């Protein structure tokens, strides 16, 4: 029975036939995937060049504040500074017109994507180098693993999918910056694990993690995971302590100045409040935009009860103050633990992860491929043991996904960590050396790569490039006297969209008031709508913007269509006699 279950032996003639199987040059694979990654990234950046998102408005506002020296506005405990520095630099140097402002932001995103591509190349090179010793031992034992060209192909396919499908260049967010730093830090940890690392390597690791923290506050706790893993990769306890201490020093060298400034501005020690606010919103159920609590230090001024209407003209600046610095408006609320709420949040995150791994539109291809390769192995447990050799990547990837699971998991957040997880998981593939299984591995790798790239290419917008709707509406606003510094109000639960913050940013206007429900406003009697508008006028609002109007909306009382859009404006002093 044991003989029947033992792996088939490879004879000399079999080995010679295996050597005659077609082989791909790793260099050719790398060049092809570099060109493919650049082409797909450029196509996505171009197709989405006129799009904008809420976070992007705040980062653009913050970048402007940093580069003009408005430190009171620039220091922000909700949005981290690094990405805004980059955006602000390009805006200050190139000074784009309103038409080109959002396309320039997407160009910056594309450049960061290229930097992430370079960081991933460095990481994948170190990962493959770290695999050579174990792969050589596997061959000596009569086993076969992924060939080097297979690692390059699979790695780049996963990178392209994670970068363009999960993070995307459509969104103006720092997630691509974070991905670049995660790949760079992971490469340095692999150097330490293989014995190629020095104190200089560990120092650089700390610096990279410090920059990652400046890109996104969640990297502060995750930096501790990276540093702990780096210490555990050392050859002995004494060296591990030295490595951890040096990494902490490098991290604090970069992070401590901003932590000090931020703590002084908040009058308490903090490395950022985005995590606590996320917990309030996604776990405790606090309203993101208009929090309600008797403990609020800065309650938002409610100027009309029904429909609920709020004014928030100061002291926070930015195109939309409620989103620019949520920490000010949430100050006084303390997140609290509730078992039922926590269970619900974790369950929602697990559903997100389930979809990530098991949806045909995401990464079911990789999940099925991995299961197939593990199941055809003589002992699947041996594959798991081999994957354990890549434990640093597994620990980092699972720690990040676990941290997000406690609050809120979104694909762009965990994208680089899922790449680490997949590479570590596929490193466990060890099959008996035979012609059929060598071809099976090759076919599986090619299939996963092709399907991942095909999904990404399919979802990259291929229709005519999106039009400059926000610019056209900003131009229409100027026709109604809306200029730099004008105070606006919007109607809707979230003031984003063509006639909201996205157009207000290009007009350099500020949204200082909001009617929270479009349906309630337009369904109210005419006298009630007039009272709401009068309250907005008394609050210093110059004009009210409305979009997504119901068909029954009464536009006879001074509402004007903005250009050829479906958005409308009411200008005080002109439309209310």
Indicate where each model-derived feature is located.
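Perimembrane helix-loop-helix junctions
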Residues: 16, 221-252, 265, 423, ...
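Extracytoplasmic catalytic/substrate-binding loops of multi-pass membrane glycan-assembly enzymes
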Residues: 48-62, 73-90, 96-103, 266-273, ...
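Transmembrane-helix motifs of polytopic, lipid-linked glycan transferases
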Residues: 107-143, 184
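Membrane-interface alpha helices of multi-pass inner-membrane proteins
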Residues: 161, 188, 201-217, 223, ...
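Lumenal/periplasmic acceptor-binding loop at the mouth of the active site in multi-pass
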Residues: 284-382, 514-517
